[in-house]
Amino acid sequence: MRPEKSFQGLILTLQRYWADYGCIILQPYDMEVGAGTFHPATTLRALGPKRWNAAYVQPSRRPKDGRYGENPNRLQHYYQFQVILKPSPEDIQDLYLKSLAAIGVDAALHDIRFVEDDWESPTLGAWGLGWECWCDGMEVSQFTYFQQVAGVECAPVAGELTYGLERLAMYVQGVDNVYDLNFNGRDGAEKVTYGDVFLQAEQEYSRHNFEHADTAMLFEQFKMAEGACKKYLDAGWASDKKDKHLMALPAYDQCIKASHVFNLLDARGVISVTERQSYILRVRELAKACGEAWIHTEAGGVRG
């Protein structure tokens, strides 16, 4: 299945490429997240001393970006391909360029540029030195050297690659409208487009996100997720010495829920500018507490 002929072929090619490199190929996290970085395979596994190489597709939701299916390249639900390499290899840029070649983008034939763009996620309490990757004037990927995640310094530094799958697919297929992407690589009556799969969902979720999401319920859900996260964090310490944590992952799930609910409230326009900063801070405090708990788990590097 040729990557330049189908959306799913592009995904399969990236999975094979990074599997051959030595990454474990994970599945998407089964929660509503705003970006692939929120997957615990990146946010939490970037912390601690243990080696970690993983790649996965992650459906991502940004409610405010919906356009009722009327914009050719703006979506409230889209896909990222995420690669996390810890410690970051010295040849990460070369590895990335070879991955582009694997999906049909030859650096010798195209203008590939790396534009400095340091990355920050306020809600995750994370930042890193980064570059946008431009191909013939269009941003197609981002790579970042994580310096801090969840308020915890990254040692060793992890390298993260994020591919915008729809944008890359539009580029290699040569289409101007995301809904025209060939999804399955077939022609004629057997051809399935991106629009066949997702256009109705974009229309319906735009109505939901902007017009009908129950704001009273969402405010309550935020408080419940915030409270549950704090409860699990408190309950997870194995002893009063707080030297080992036993429930970092369930707590982090609640942090993810709080973040998505905040994004829905933001899309509904019921949060003021001042309140918005307060909500971001509240989610960040949860994320930082989860990161602190994680580095006291076995996978986070604690002994015993």
Curated annotation (Swiss-Prot):
One annotated GO molecular function is: glycine-tRNA ligase activity
Which subcellular locations apply to this protein?
Cytoplasm
| Any one Gene Ontology BP term | glycyl-tRNA aminoacylation
This chain belongs to the protein called Glycine--tRNA ligase alpha subunit
Q: Which UniProt keywords apply?
A: Aminoacyl-tRNA synthetase, ATP-binding, Cytoplasm, Ligase, Nucleotide-binding, Protein biosynthesis
UniProt subunit comment: Tetramer of two alpha and two beta subunits.
Q: Which PANTHER family match?
A: GLYCINE--TRNA LIGASE, CHLOROPLASTIC_MITOCHONDRIAL 2 (PTHR30075:SF2), GLYCYL-TRNA SYNTHETASE (PTHR30075)
Record NCBIfam families: glyQ, PRK09348.1
Q: Does the keyword Metal-binding apply?
A: no
**Cited InterPro entries:** aa-tRNA-synth_II/BPL/LPL, Gly-tRNA-synth_heterodimer, Gly-tRNA_ligase_asu
User: What HAMAP family does the record point to?
Assistant: Gly_tRNA_synth_alpha
Indicate the enzyme's highest-level EC class.
ligase
Catalysed conversion reaction: tRNA(Gly) + glycine + ATP = glycyl-tRNA(Gly) + AMP + diphosphate
Q: What is its EC number?
A: 6.1.1.14
- A GO CC annotation given for this chain: cytosol
